[in-house]
């Protein structure tokens, strides 16, 4: 009897709402999921790692990578890995915010591509959001397509990897609605840039998340120190 081969996808899973939904969509799409998480010296590294592990358990993911890339703290120039720079709490501003980690998603995708090539995966899922987001330049559809081209040019000839961005043109409200529809355990996810016990409620990430729940007419299941 021939063994049925399963198609594999590498899911970049931070433990946040977007990457978690993206991973659930990969499961719905019929992929065997290999999860990748990056510890890059961010303020909420320990809390995000806990969220990642909890979500992997919920998805029954057998194969996962926890990759340490501490050099982001040496580069600095952002409020997530440079503790001398305060995380903004006054609301979303125009332009690229100080919470943007220089070329983070490009580096994440490059490392994930190496894992995909090793594992024989045909797809990589990343939960970037272009429309209703902080405006990071490495979250656009154009950037992802350029990275896909570079990855497929820079890997073995028989390696063909699709980068799937199921949320890129969704609003936060649509993300909340889709997550609820797919029974995503949103109570296990973590989005806050500042805190690890209770979400601050005032950083850009908390504001975007709370706005999404409000616009979707739903209550966020996690606790907040304060509301915007």
UniProtKB/Swiss-Prot annotation:
Gene3D superfamilies: HUPs. The keyword Repeat does not apply. Pfam families: QueC. Its EC number is 6.3.4.20. Binds 1 zinc ion per subunit. The keyword Nucleotide-binding applies. It catalyses: 7-carboxy-7-deazaguanine + NH4(+) + ATP = 7-cyano-7-deazaguanine + ADP + phosphate + H2O + H(+). Pathway: Purine metabolism; 7-cyano-7-deazaguanine biosynthesis. CDD domains: QueC-like. Zn(2+) binds at residues 192, 200, 203, 206. One of its GO terms (molecular function) is zinc ion binding. Its cofactor is Zn(2+). GO terms for biological process: queuosine biosynthetic process. Catalyzes the ATP-dependent conversion of 7-carboxy-7-deazaguanine (CDG) to 7-cyano-7-deazaguanine (preQ(0)). This is 7-cyano-7-deazaguanine synthase. It comes from Aliarcobacter butzleri (strain RM4018).
């Amino acid at each position: 009897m021939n063994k049925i081969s399963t198609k594999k996808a590498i899911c970049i899973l931070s433990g946040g709402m977007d990457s978690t939904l993206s991973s659930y969509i990969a499961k719905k799409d019929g992929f065997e999921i290999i999860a990748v998480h990056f510890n890059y010296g961010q303020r909420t590294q320990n809390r995000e790692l806990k969220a990642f592990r909890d979500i992997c358990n919920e998805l029954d993911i057998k194969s996962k990578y926890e990759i340490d890339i501490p050099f982001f703290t040496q580069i600095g120039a952002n409020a997530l890995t440079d503790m001398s720079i305060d995380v903004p709490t006054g609301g979303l501003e125009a332009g690229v915010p100080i919470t943007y980690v220089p070329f983070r998603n490009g580096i994440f995708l490059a490392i994930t591509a190496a894992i995909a090539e090793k594992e024989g995966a045909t797809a990589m899922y990343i939960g970037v959001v272009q429309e209703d987001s902080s405006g990071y330049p490495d979250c656009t559809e154009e950037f992802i397509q350029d990275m896909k081209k570079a990855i497929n040019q820079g890997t073995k000839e028989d390696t063909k990897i699709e980068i799937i961005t199921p949320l890129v043109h969704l609003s936060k409200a649509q993300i909340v609605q889709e997550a609820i529809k797919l029974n995503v355990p949103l109570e296990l996810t973590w989005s806050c840039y500042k805190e690890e016990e209770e979400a601050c409620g005032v950083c850009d990430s908390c504001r975007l998340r709370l706005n999404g729940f409000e616009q979707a007419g739903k209550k966020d299941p996690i606790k907040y120190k304060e509301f915007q």
